[in-house]
């Protein structure tokens, strides 16, 4: 798939949609235009995506995962995004993510899954919206 350079807008501002097949090119373009928000779309058509590329956009404020993002290399590189304020997951993911490692996180919106870890230790959170949360205790 060719790189989609269309700049869209939602309630969080302008964003770039990056597809798994053009992940590296999309991140480079996001860095070039200094966009504050990206939306990562399902990468089932590509072998893997390397989250080390995210280090090229350290000022990112909002990241959204649309679809199930699989085959991730260097997952820990996502924690280099120290300015992230909002994270959205449209559906359960196959990776584990420690929300408390984002020092400026303010909001999470997600379909809950057990890999969504330590959100109860992310003390800067102002709001959490979970769908399909079957537990009774957010401390689990």
Predicted regions and their residues:
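Concave beta-strand-loop units of leucine-rich repeat
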Residues: 2-28, 34-55, 59-97, 101-140
């Amino acid at each position: 798939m060719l790189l989609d350079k269309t700049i869209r807008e939602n309630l969080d501002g302008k964003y770039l949609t990056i597809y798994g097949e053009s992940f590296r090119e999309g991140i480079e373009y996001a860095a070039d235009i200094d966009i504050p928000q990206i939306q990562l779309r399902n990468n089932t058509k590509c072998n893997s995506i390397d989250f080390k590329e995210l280090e090229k956009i350290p000022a990112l404020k909002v990241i959204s995962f649309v679809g199930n993002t699989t085959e991730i290399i260097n997952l820990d590189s996502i924690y280099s995004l120290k300015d992230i304020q909002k994270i959205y997951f449209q559906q359960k993911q196959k990776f584990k993510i420690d929300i408390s490692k984002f020092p400026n996180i303010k909001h999470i919106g997600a379909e809950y899954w057990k890999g969504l870890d330590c959100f109860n230790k992310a003390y800067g959170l102002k709001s959490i919206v979970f769908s399909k949360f079957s537990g009774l205790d957010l401390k689990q």
